[in-house]
Amino acid sequence: MNRFFRIALLVLMSAIGMSVMAQESAQIPVDPKVRIGKLSNGLTYYIRHNDYPKGQAEFYIAQKVGSIMEEDNQRGLAHFLEHMCFNGTKSFPGNNLVQWCESVGIKFGYNLNAYTSIERTVYNISGVPTARESVQDSCLLILHDWANDLLLDEKEIDAERSVIHEEWRSQMSPQQRVMEKLLPIMYPNSRYGYRLPIGIMDVVDNFPYQALRDYYE
């Protein structure tokens, strides 16, 4: 077993090293067709006209918040917040956000999605029809609500605990278990070794409602 872990560690470190080298050597220039600006609240925006696919727009909001920012008693809250963005906002309470998106052709899980990583959380709305300007306005309102106005209803929080628990269970492959054991070796005395976004289920199952609200704020 020890020999297996040594081999796995070497393979993983080699893969990460190659990835870092590729990132360092490939600096992608900024597209001159992209409009870049910064709002008074600190939000940096990027806008680019795109004719493909024709008649559709895409919206993304990337937040520099990931699992690396969590304390030990918060492990999994960044990912939990990502899930809660689809369970009620000020402008779209309950399941209204998903229902409205589906009504205009934006499919949940395909066009409407998000992910949490160690260093960031990214939400996206794609395949947005541009024929009606009001639809684009509503998508911008959704981005606003995600950043500022989640309801974080207690019943919705409790319902989502089991959803995330099932997601965790589905991820517990042999490769994932090896990864969890290798990361602390690769990153000793660092949060990077202990901050997989899914978190730990003891926190997910038992955190107080206010803990999630405080983390959001």
Question: Where are the predicted features?
Answer:
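M16/MPP (pitrilysin/insulinase) zinc-metallopeptidase core fold and M16-derived inactive scaffolds
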Residues: 58-126, 173-174, 178, 194-200, ...
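Histidine-acidic residue clusters that define the catalytic metal-binding segment
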Residues: 23-35, 123-126, 133, 141, ...
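Acidic/histidine-enriched alpha-helical segments
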Residues: 94, 98-102, 150-169, 180
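Bacterial N-terminal signal peptides
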Residues: 7-19
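Positively charged n-region of N-terminal signal peptides that target proteins for export
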Residues: 1-7
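M16/insulysin-pitrilysin zinc metalloprotease superfamily fold
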Residues: 91, 125-160
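Mature N-terminal segment immediately following signal peptide/propeptide cleavage
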Residues: 24-61
